[in-house]
A protein has these predicted regions:
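Non-catalytic interaction-recognition regions
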Residues: 1-90, 101, 105-544
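Short, charged, solvent-exposed linker or helix-capping segments at domain edges/interfaces
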Residues: 91-96
Length: 544
């Protein structure tokens, strides 16, 4: 219906010989402002040098008649509000029943090649709750963007080079020796997590004390420990519903000479200089807002973390992606300007990189704060979260707030089986519809394919029909704004509309024609609930 209104406006503008204007149509929050509204008249004020209400009148007078439109009105300074005939709203049901699992698809992405990199936790320990939020948000965003016509690839960057891996090796060797009964003390800045103890025991069980005789002990442990940690990370992410297209090794950047190539590229562009024995990147001259220049190679010859990151992002862009999306934690906020500066320095555009920042998660249980501490072995992990509330609830609660806002996650609420639990409220709507459809199947031979949608004129049916029609637009908005929480908001609204409908209408009655129209309506709701839940990686149970 929204597309039809855009076409009607385009037809009117063509008659008025007005071309090259983007037409925006929205769904007003207040029903008094119609079913759809456009500000096109106000957009044209500067061009036509007329009062927007006068322009609105001219546009309306040239809109072709359409049997689905009840009336068109001018509101406020020049909004054009469209009121759709209630009997026409039912056409969305046919669309949903035909599209089924494809309902919600749109082409706002137009095939744009996007690389989404997320979680990318160091392979030095168990994933914590901050990683869980990143995972739930990013995987949902990937699903939404794919539904919206983006050609998207999902990537995990394995930080298998650098000091954190040196610490991992030291920690693993100490735990291995301790497992053998030897005296060995874990340094204070080493990794103290339970997973490293398990790793030490695993090394002992598999190799006995034979590793102590190896000259390449550290090199062997390095490869073994990284592989072990990545296996655990992949297992946890898989159980959380995540899949990746590519796992990219930081170490491969060095092995394949990509770091040197990136440095050569920066030198060729003329944005590096030497000072105090170090090599610097002149980020302050690149217009991305960095407040000071950044070191690439230290005076002792070692590389900074930024240098390998620059090489990685050059590699991403060289692979032909139009847009890079990096999802990082709140502690990386100051990193954005220097990263953007680095790709500008290599001849790319700053807007080819978007860094999405995840804010912190606070865990609660019945309103009381649950403390986290990563290096003491007492951190609440992603695995703990899955075991405590289940993957569905964990994902839903981690996605339902905007990524740039702090999130309180209450275990007690997530486990409640009541309307106070937003996920339960949504999933129960789906299960309730499945129950009604089973009853209908047992009670009679109903045909929902050619039913009379004009019978769906009561206020609760109309509200449902409008909400159903909004779904593709909501998906497109969630994709272009990188805001998966819009899907959760939509699910709450759709579930609420359904529960109101159910409480005020008896679906299966002796009136077969009315029953069939209601069954068609709730089937469309069921499909849309399922499709929306799938976008955030949550199941749609048929029984609860």
């Amino acid at each position: 219906m929204k597309n039809k209104i855009i076409e009607l406006l385009q037809s009117s503008l063509a008659k008025l010989e007005i071309n090259g204007v983007d037409i925006y149509v929205v769904t007003p929050k207040n029903n008094d402002n119609g079913d759809f509204s456009s500000n096109i008249a106000m957009q044209l004020t500067r061009v036509l040098k007329k009062n927007p209400r006068v322009i609105a009148e001219e546009i309306i007078s040239n809109i072709p008649e359409d049997e689905s439109i009840e009336k068109i009105e001018i509101a406020g300074p020049g909004f054009i509000n469209f009121y759709v005939k209630k009997s026409s709203l039912g056409s969305v049901i046919s669309t949903i029943l035909t599209d089924n699992e494809k309902y919600g698809e749109n082409n706002v992405g137009q095939g744009k090649k996007v690389l989404l990199e997320y979680v990318s936790a160091n392979p030095t320990g168990t994933l914590h709750v901050g990683h869980a939020r990143n995972a739930a948000y990013s995987d949902s965003l990937a699903r939404i963007m794919k539904k919206s016509g983006y050609n998207l690839s999902r990537e995990y960057y394995i930080n298998d080079a650098g000091n954190q891996i040196n610490n991992l090796v030291i920690s693993a060797i100490v735990r291995y020796k301790q497992a053998l009964g030897l005296e060995a003390e874990l340094p204070e800045d080493a990794y103290h997590g339970e997973d490293i103890k398990v790793l030490g025991q695993k090394l002992k069980d598999e190799f006995g004390d034979s590793l102590l005789e190896r000259e390449d002990l550290e090199s062997f442990i390095r490869d073994y420990a990284v592989a072990y940690e990545m296996e655990n990370i992949k297992k946890d992410l898989g159980d959380f519903g995540l899949e990746y297209d590519v796992y990219f090794s930081e170490k491969s950047l060095y092995e394949n000479g990509l770091v040197d190539k990136a440095l050569d590229s920066l030198r060729e562009q003329g944005y590096v200089y030497e000072k105090d024995g170090a090599l610097w990147l002149e980020t302050t001259a690149l217009g991305t807002g960095d407040d000071k220049d950044r070191v690439l190679i230290k005076a002792d010859g070692s590389l900074t973390y930024l240098t390998s990151d620059i090489a990685y992002h050059k590699n991403k862009l060289d692979r032909g992606f139009d847009l890079l999306l990096d999802v990082l934690g709140a502690d990386h906020h100051g990193y954005i300007a220097r990263l953007k500066a680095s790709i500008v320095a290599m001849g790319y555009k700053a807007e080819q990189l978007e860094v999405l920042i995840m804010q912190m998660v606070q865990l609660l249980n019945n309103g009381e704060v649950v403390k986290m501490s990563k290096r003491t072995g007492k951190a609440i992990t992603l695995r703990d979260l899955i075991d405590e509330v289940g993957a569905d609830a964990a994902r839903y609660f981690l996605v339902m707030r905007s990524a740039d806002s702090h999130l309180d996650f209450d275990f007690a609420v997530a486990k409640e089986q009541s309307s106070d639990n937003p996920l339960y409220y949504v999933q129960y709507a789906h299960a309730r519809i499945c129950s009604i459809l089973r009853q209908a199947s047992e009670q009679g031979d109903f045909n929902i394919e050619n039913c009379n949608y004009e019978l769906l004129t009561d206020e609760y049916s109309v509200e449902l029909l409008k909400n159903l029609a909004y779904f593709p637009e909501i998906v497109a908005q969630a994709a272009t704004n990188y805001e998966p929480h819009r899907i959760c908001n939509y699910l709450q609204n759709l579930a609420s509309s359904f529960h109101k409908f159910y409480n005020n209408n008896k679906v299966i009655t002796e009136n077969k024609e009315q029953t069939e129209s209601y069954l068609a309506l709730i089937t469309a709701v069921k499909i849309t609930l399922r499709n929306a839940l799938e976008l955030i990686g949550v199941s749609a149970p048929e029984k609860m």
